[in-house]
Amino acid sequence: MNALIQSKVQCKKPELSETKCFKMHIGKDKLNCSNLEVNGKVMKTTNSEKYLGDVLSSSGKNDENVQMRYEKGMGIINSIMSILKEISFGQHYFEIGMLLRTSMLVNGILFNLEALNNLSVAQINLLEECDKILMRRMFDAQQGTPIEAFYLETSVWPLRHILMARKLMYYWTIIHKSESELVKEVFNAQRDFPTEGSWLSEVQGVLQSCNINYTVDQISKMSQAKFKNIVKERIQSKVLVYLVTLQNKHTKSENLHLDSKMQPYLRTEVLSLSEKKLLFSLRTKMLRLKANFSSMFGNILTCSVCKEVNSIETEFHLLNCSFIKKDKVLVNEMQQVAYEDVFSDIAKQTKVVKVFKKIMTIFDKQKTLGEKQNEK
């Protein structure tokens, strides 16, 4: 073995030394391991080593890699938000935001993960935490905003489903590789000698869950475009089931639905960026009102400004609040809208969000004044 290593060194002429070369043992039995050498010196033994940006571990675990991707993702989020704040994208703010999410965050933290196996649920959740943070910052959303709301409104896939699609497309790529390539030889070995926990067994599980029941021979005869369309269609169905499952656990997102495109109000030129963010808060019932955060206010939900008995501080109440109605100009506008308009067409959404914008200005001002008086 040492002679082979030395031969490779002489042929390739790389700058190798004992500081650059390590040996890593995989498995439990170390009795038959030889002492490998490079340039006449014994290689050092290591349990983990960074190679081409990823950490190779003797345990086969992905903890270090996932943690590195998470930390990288946090840096990418700051870069994306800097771009969105420093450059005025007008009505295209959210569209550009989703493009930056895909090109920078998704590609940055999911790069080559389709080739890894045994990613745990906890590890996938950690990577998705980056996505959640980006979404919240992009929408200026409260911490408790249901995560499915972001995906339903923007019509993008959660990271776990993007990773599924990438694994399946990598599966197609391997099938179409030459039999002489190393990756194809490994693939064939995993197919001929099935092992629980192997990359192929994991992909087969994804295929089954997506109801893609084609054989290797059938897939080998498919074009990339055809297989990609099949994958996209099946993953889209899984995304819908996943988001609806989450939605059923949260009443705040119950009126939202998944569309083929981003919601029109996020793309329109009629609304300003602040109005779009306000409309999102209205649609997800995440305005800073007592009824939306009842536990935070000890279930004391009386309106902070009118303080009427039996009044409950909700979006519905604000449209009928006696204190807000003291503004005689605004009261006429309030009578022309309903809370349900936030789920209607652009025309009605525009009217209702502009009314709520004025309402919240009065509400916040009076609430702040009341809090200062209470402090005295």
Describe each model-derived feature in a short phrase.
Residues 1-8, 55, 69, 76-83, ...:
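Generic, well-ordered alpha-helical scaffold segments in large soluble proteins
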Residues 2-15, 322-330:
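Classical protein tyrosine phosphatase
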Residues 3, 7, 14-47, 68:
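Short, conserved micro-motifs composed of acidic
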Residues 40-117, 173, 181:
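Basic, alpha-helical interaction scaffolds
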Residues 42-46, 87-104, 145, 153, ...:
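Structural motif
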Residues 83, 87-90, 246-376:
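Family-specific functional microsites
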Residues 123-126, 130-131, 136-281:
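Acidic catalytic cores of enzymes that act on phosphate-bearing nucleotides/polynucleotides
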